Amino acid sequence: RCGLRTNSGNDIRSARRSLNLLFSEWGNRGVHLWKVQLNEQQLTAGVATYTVPTNVNDVLEAYISSTAQAADGPATNDIALTKIDRSAYSALPNKLATGQPSQYYVNRQIDPTISLYVAPDASTYTYLKFYSINRIEDAGSFTNTADVAYRFLPCMCSGLAFYLSQKRAPDRIQVLKQLYEDELIRALNED
């Protein structure tokens, strides 16, 4: 697509780096439904902050859950939590007060955490459940299958051609960028 021939191992390594940057850029653009995952974290009384897996880019929604024994078997009760930003979380008083959590804050660092307000007493609500959007895995070795849903494959090819054109075919940048953006819009609309 960008009018080049692969002549060296360096070209292939450059393409892999460009592909990894493309995947990172997709993560910055928004939610990709094939990377949404339900996570569970057992709550500990008085503990407000929990570490989440490092591949989590963000938490879309969260709730606390309890399971109680009912006459017809176990019954699950879920309470949705409200997501707040860092400023709102910082302004909250006494973050170690215990009770039924109603809000959560996601600290999106290299090792992300999720903080509940108030800290759970863990007598009734025993689990935190949350839907996370996970990072797209790097391209890895040259034989790996891309961590991409099939409807994003045309977009991936166009995006890679656009990224490579920035290095090797600057005269084709505008054409390839437009093709990439068109393919991306189609894929996102389908997602």
What are these regions (language model features)?
Residues 1-191:
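Glycine-enriched, solvent-exposed interface loops adjoining structured elements
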